[in-house]
């Protein structure tokens, strides 16, 4: 008999909460589980719940519904009716990377000294929130807070609010906002049938790339399915500290690096906006134009307006779907046995069209009895 050792996370670091999935400590052995549990998506665009710094990851992925690559299916023996072509969802441009350097010391979770750590999937707001108090090797304390969202209102949009405050001393900061294409997979086990197909060559091929001020646009296309993808990022930095920025981009990489002379107690707010557009027919010029139109609108709105729209969407969702969260039953609706809003001590009658009652009558059984 095969025995498997079950990994049990420490309960104090993963406390139960009504509205949040909480992580109170960094545990590398649970990276894969947390990336899945803390993922954000809106049905079109999805981002696994890895850290903003780009790692460490079990399988860092940003995915788009319907963006796939085709490949031949090879069988040991061929037969009539066997599928010849397979389709695999491919990882797209990772635009959520934000790296932090304090006096040239990188913030990297496996080697960092966090004095406090809190990361949570906020089910009321539809965001992934994180707050870390980091002490650098030089003893400088840095408060890092971030909030990530994938918009439910505009399916092409995602955004990150990344905030840094030095508490006890000044320092030279670099906040590097990056986007990367065709990153190698971190942990792919070729013998695991649950894993996605491994492509040996390039999947996304460069079509167009350019930068405008703090905005970078990268356009790629799959080789065989000929689906086109455009990813654009733009930024807004707010701080009273002296700062400058530098933009670098290539076929598969984009970077906007902000250099800040941070003072203690002076907050630094970076808003990063990401836009994804795909098409099976539009060319690179048209798709880049669409991404720019969307980005212009998003930048004008700002992160707070995106967040407010997200919170309103989630509030409407919970009110409509959950009777206990403010949903008011219509006058003609009768309480159901499984309806937590109904009175369990009072008898009730089902609507005339109740499918469960019809099935019971056809089977010669009694209809629902009143709850006693």
Where is each model-derived feature located?
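Acidic/polar, glycine-enriched structural segments that form the non-catalytic walls/loops
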Residues: 2-372
């Amino acid at each position: 008999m095969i025995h498997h050792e079950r990994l049990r996370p420490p309960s104090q670091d993963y406390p139960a909460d009504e509205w949040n999935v909480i992580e109170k400590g960094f545990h590398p052995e649970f990276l894969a589980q947390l990336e899945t549990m803390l993922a954000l998506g809106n049905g079109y665009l999805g981002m696994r719940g890895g850290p903003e710094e780009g790692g460490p990851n079990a399988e860092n992925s940003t995915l788009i519904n319907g963006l796939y690559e085709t490949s031949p299916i090879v069988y040991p023996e061929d037969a009539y009716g066997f599928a010849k072509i397979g389709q695999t969802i491919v990882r797209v441009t990772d635009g959520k990377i934000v790296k932090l350097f304090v006096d040239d010391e990188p913030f990297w979770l496996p080697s960092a000294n966090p004095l406090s750590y809190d990361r949570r999937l906020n089910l009321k707001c539809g965001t992934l929130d994180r707050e870390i108090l980091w002490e650098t090797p030089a003893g400088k304390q840095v408060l890092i807070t971030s909030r990530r969202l994938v918009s439910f209102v505009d399916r092409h949009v995602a955004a990150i609010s990344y905030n840094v405050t030095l508490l006890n001393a000044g320092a030279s900061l670099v906040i590097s906002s990056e986007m990367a294409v065709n990153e190698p997979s971190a942990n792919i086990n070729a013998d695991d049938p649950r894993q996605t197909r491994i492509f040996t060559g390039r999947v996304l091929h460069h079509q167009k790339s350019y930068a405008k001020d703090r905005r970078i646009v990268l356009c790629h296309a799959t080789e065989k399915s000929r689906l086109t993808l455009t990813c654009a990022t733009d930024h807004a930095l707010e701080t009273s500290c002296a700062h400058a920025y530098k933009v670098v981009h290539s076929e598969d990489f984009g970077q906007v690096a902000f250099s800040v002379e941070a003072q203690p107690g002076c907050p630094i707010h970076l808003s990063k906006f990401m836009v994804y557009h795909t098409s099976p027919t539009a060319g690179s010029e048209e798709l880049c134009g669409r991404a720019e139109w969307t980005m212009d609108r998003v930048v004008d709105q700002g992160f707070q307006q995106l967040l407010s729209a997200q919170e309103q969407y989630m509030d409407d969702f919970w009110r409509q779907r959950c009777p206990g969260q403010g949903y008011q039953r219509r006058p003609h609706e009768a309480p159901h046995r499984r309806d937590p809003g109904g009175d369990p001590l009072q008898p009730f009658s089902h609507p005339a069209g109740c499918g469960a009652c019809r099935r019971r009558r056809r089977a010669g059984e009694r209809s629902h009895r009143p709850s006693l």
